Amino acid sequence: MLQSEIDISSCDLCPRVCGVDRGAGARGVCGADGRLRIARAALHFWEEPPISGTHGSGTVFFSWCPLRCVYCQNAVIADGEAGAEISIGRLSQIYSELQAKGALNINLVTPTHYAPHARAALDLARERGMGLPVVWNTSGYETVRAVRENRGYADVYLTDYKYASSDLAARYSKAPNYPQVALDALSAMVDEVGDPCFDEYEGDERMTRGVVVRHLMLPGALEDSKRVVQTVWEHFGSSVLLSIMNQYTPVLAESAKAGDAWACRELERCPELARRVPNEDYERLLDFADSLGIEDYFWQEGGAAEESFIPAFDLEGVLSE
């Protein structure tokens, strides 16, 4: 399939449903027009153990983002600053190249606004023998229809559940409907791919089906994080794997310090985002998860917030080798 054959003339790929004609060059709320743009394609070692293993996850970072959180850890790609335009054919080659490098899976990071492109490239790669599981790595801000359209393409969902509070979702992501939209999407994901399944691949335990729900704890938001954990547990129990993350990095404050005018304004509006999450708050959240009876979840060592979790978006693996 050629990019010109993909219909995004009234774009409704994400819950923003902005309706612009991306195919004609207009940019959606996500920032993207109709051209496929990728910032990095390489082995990535900082996902959850059954996603990265010791060999690495074959991770493709798509430029732009439908959610555009003010504290985004990958702002340079969410804002479209990093990336190069490639064809669907080239993306299919990237999938195959990552398999040849020993990747455990193909990990598509923030692909929502390029979902038709990503699926078309998977069709081409599979015709050439690419057989790895596909991880759909998403902010959670997906429509139920979009999840259904991924049937046969997404094997594992690595999805965020960022907020239980509509107020926080509005404050940080301009998406007050996020809590319900993400919960509906999560229900559809569980329905589509089922309970977690694993195999062994080159000595690593690899997740081949199922859903991992990530929650990144934010500074000053302990009570909302508790509501997130409780909501996920009460709705899905052990049907999903929960990952409680402590790697928030105050990149907004760093940008403001460097003189970025937009970052300065946003930091003035949200001054709490200038600090890291105290280890004591993170420990309280883990204790709360334990008190609910959640026995098997991913957590991070204290002081996990480091820029080492943020890759260099230097076009590695994107252009033809």
Locate the predicted segments by residue.
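Auxiliary Fe-S-binding modules of radical SAM enzymes
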Residues: 1-26, 195-321
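Conserved Radical SAM active-site core
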Residues: 31-152, 156-157, 165-166
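Hydrophobic faces of well-ordered beta-strands that scaffold small-molecule active sites
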Residues: 58, 106, 134-136, 157-159, ...
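Conserved radical SAM core fold
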Residues: 78, 115, 140-143, 161-179, ...
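Alpha-helix N-cap and loop-to-helix initiation/capping positions
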Residues: 86, 113, 173-181, 220, ...
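Aromatic/hydrophobic pocket-lining residues that form the small-molecule binding cavity
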Residues: 91, 118, 147, 182, ...
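Alpha-helix-loop-beta-strand connector modules within alpha/beta enzyme cores
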Residues: 121-135, 184-192, 279-285
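Anionic-ligand binding region
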Residues: 170-203
